[in-house]
């Protein structure tokens, strides 16, 4: 089932998520690049109406002495047939295409960079994203991660928006399995119809991890987060979040999180 994911470490966001049922060939070495191709489709949704994707990627393209380029191209389309019991044919779905370019730069400004651009289109809905992630060590015991992203979503009937996000985290090894983390982030969403929404969050966490490095896993964190948002953001609250915060424009949460990799 697993094929490929490309994510930002600080906020666990998947820039590319080619994960699903299918088959493919990975990392065919052509010298200048390693090429991977797969056919992905989930036939468990409906017997007569499915959607397939053809993820194609070229990685390890040496564009800089200290950096590499990865290119992702993913076309998608509908596969359908008439239901032989009801004699109803599924409604047409638009074709899709996604193109992503991701450049790594190591050792610049004392750290490692991931610079990305992605554009995808399905019918009348379009998304464009630019992202920069930076990772470094402030001291032998403290790691720093910073991420900034800007998205433009275009959709019919003023259904799109523009989204700016920026955040940073420090992760300090205190001794033994114990760590201390600080995070700060800000999001701004400008919908095509409606007022601009803003939210700023601050988090402090104490953690115990199986290793000295920031990426050591498994880890358990006890965290406290305080967030501040404006009236436009408050009006979008729903469900349990609205039940808890109501007409407030700030709030605090505390929790425990466990994480492991394999």
PLM regions with names:
Residues 204, 216, 245-262:
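Outer-membrane beta-barrel "beta-signal"
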């Amino acid at each position: 089932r697993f094929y490929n994911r490309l994510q930002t470490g600080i906020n666990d966001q998947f820039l590319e998520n080619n994960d699903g049922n299918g088959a493919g060939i990975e990392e065919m070495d052509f010298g200048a690049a390693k090429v991977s191709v797969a056919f992905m489709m989930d036939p468990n949704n409906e017997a007569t109406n499915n959607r397939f994707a053809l993820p194609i990627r070229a990685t390890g393209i040496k564009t800089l002495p200290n950096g590499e380029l990865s290119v992702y191209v993913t076309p998608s389309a509908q596969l359908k047939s008439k239901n032989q019991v009801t004699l109803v044919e599924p409604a047409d779905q638009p074709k899709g295409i996604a193109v992503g370019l991701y450049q790594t730069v190591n050792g610049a400004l004392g750290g490692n960079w991931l610079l990305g651009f992605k554009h995808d289109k399905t019918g009348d809905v379009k998304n464009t994203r630019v992202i920069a992630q930076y990772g470094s060590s402030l001291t032998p015991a403290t790691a720093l991660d910073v991420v900034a992203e800007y998205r433009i979503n275009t959709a019919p009937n003023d259904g799109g928006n523009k989204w700016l996000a920026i955040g940073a985290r420090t992760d300090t090894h205190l001794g033994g399995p114990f760590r201390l983390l600080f995070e700060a982030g800000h999001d701004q969403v400008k919908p095509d119809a409606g007022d601009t929404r803003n939210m700023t969050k601050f988090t402090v966490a104490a953690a115990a991890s199986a290793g000295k490095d920031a990426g050591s896993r498994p880890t358990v964190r006890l965290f406290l987060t305080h967030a501040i948002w404006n009236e436009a953001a408050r009006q979008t609250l729903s469900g349990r979040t609205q039940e808890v915060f109501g007409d407030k424009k700030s709030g605090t949460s505390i929790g425990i999180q466990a994480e492991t990799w394999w």
